[in-house]
Swiss-Prot record:
Core subunit of the mitochondrial membrane respiratory chain NADH dehydrogenase (Complex I) which catalyzes electron transfer from NADH through the respiratory chain, using ubiquinone as an electron acceptor. Essential for the catalytic activity and assembly of complex I. Disulfide bonds: none annotated. InterPro entries: NADH_DH_su5_C, NADHpl_OxRdtase_5_subgr, ND/Mrp_TM, NU5C-like, Proton_antipo_N. This is NADH-ubiquinone oxidoreductase chain 5. The gene is MT-ND5.
Amino acid sequence: MNPFASLTLTTLIILTIPIMMSNSNIYKTNLYPNYVKTTVSYAFTLSLVPLLMFMHTGQEMIISNWHWMTLQTVELSLSFKMDYFSVMFIPVALFVTWSIMEFSMWYMHSDPFINRFFKYLVLFLITMMILVTANNLFQLFIGWEGVGIMSFLLIGWWHGRTDANTAALQAILYNRIGDIGFVLSMAWFLTHSNAWDLQQIFMLNNECPNMPLIGLLLAAAGKSAQFGLHPWLPSAMEGPTPVSALLHSSTMVVAGVFLLIRFYPLMETNKLVQTMTLCLGAITTLFTALCAITQNDIKKIVAFSTSSQLGLMMVTIGINQPHLAFLHICMHAFFKAMLFMCSGSIIHSLNDEQDIRKMGGLYKAMPFTTTALIIGSLALTGMPYLTGFYSKDLIIEAVNMSYTNAWALLMTLIATSLTAAYSTRIIFFAFLGKPRFPPLVLINENNPLLINSIKRLLIGSIFAGFIISNNIPPMTVPNTTMPLYMKMTALIVTIMGFMLALELNNTTYYLKFKYPSQTYKFSNMLGYYPSIMHRLPTYHNLSMSQKSASSLLDLIWLETILPKTTSFIQMKMSIMVSNQKGLIKLYFLSFLITIMISMTLFNYHE
């Protein structure tokens, strides 16, 4: 086995050491979180070597060394696919997770079960690594289900809270809907291709029909929270902030997009599925950006921004640019994790206050967090020469040059503008103006665990885009020719969003309270989607069940059919066989009339 394969496998095996140490004495002490964090940092350092080797040689590799089982004619083996996507993604995921774990040591320091929390985080990372490196559908499905169950455990970490339990159940149920599509696609490929290895599937299905690809699209929509299966993502904010940062930056939510990127050789020849992906992504990115504008929970605003960026990635796949979508996944991980960690820093300092209306004036008390959040927001909006610019600007250019669907283009541009608007809103409400929180709150951001973790991602949010985009294939990008206004589209719509948000904030700062309009309610209530989908079907099902139980069983069978029907039949039968009606007065009168008539007749003959 060459060094490339050996070092890659070593990186993956190192991550399992903290899990295996669960039975040791280290797990029972306070040193375990630090041990896990150090292990992940070593794994990251080691993963850079295969990345550099891949960048130098450009050779992909499949490691297949352990036979699992044989199902009739399908042979399943433990195989790892070390290609452009997996070799690039592993260091990014490890770097971000390393920072999040250091942040967790500060954020979760008072939790009595912090060791178990770190074990869950490592398991979450391992399952994501399995998903990314899998070379067959069965192994990919193990990683897919692994991130699902670990997200359930981590979102519901504070299981004493009803909202946390509800959010965890909601996440797992929406993902179950997506899993139906995944299992359907697996069954189709097994039936028609007799293979689950990715190379065999791509060779045997040059022109893939719609059914398996639509199944994969459904799976991606569930995992990446696309429109229709999106409500679980903002609800997942009930979990601890490190979970939100890990879930929404480099792991679970990008798994759906990553699945479609893996299957791009089949999708690029299927125009119907590409169009569906494009439209779904455009609707998601616009709808979630609209919802983010009126939210007041700082974590939910960042969560909706994640959903909006996932929609943008789906749009990119829809215009047949999977490598560009993957580049955006890598860039997005840095600043999105940092935005969540800055939110966590604010929430922790303000005694778990998440409402941006109860913040304000924090730029003096928390200068480092303010700087990091502003740079993260600028990177999110695609400000030139920050990390987000190197992928987002290319995506907008590619969408502009595409002639596929003008409506999808327009929706994407509006969502890009709204990204700047809600980012400005967070900055304006949380950091500027006068303080709107109690004066006795102790604010301290000088913990080295917090500072170092955010600082690392801050450097990544500034320089990672330049470093990655200049060192990955293709090394030489051909010069594109396009009009200046088209090249500047992304920047223009972003600046328009900033100006609109500043104008709105300045205008509304001194206004009196006005009753919310229907448009505001539509955005604030997330388009009424959760209310309708979570309440109406369940209410109607329960009421129908109740009515069928009470009306069908109790009212009809136990009351109408047996007692009432029996008594009614008996009454009818008694009426039929009886001559007497119980009319006493009429009976006496008939007797009297009969006597009078008979006496009259007898007297007449005399």
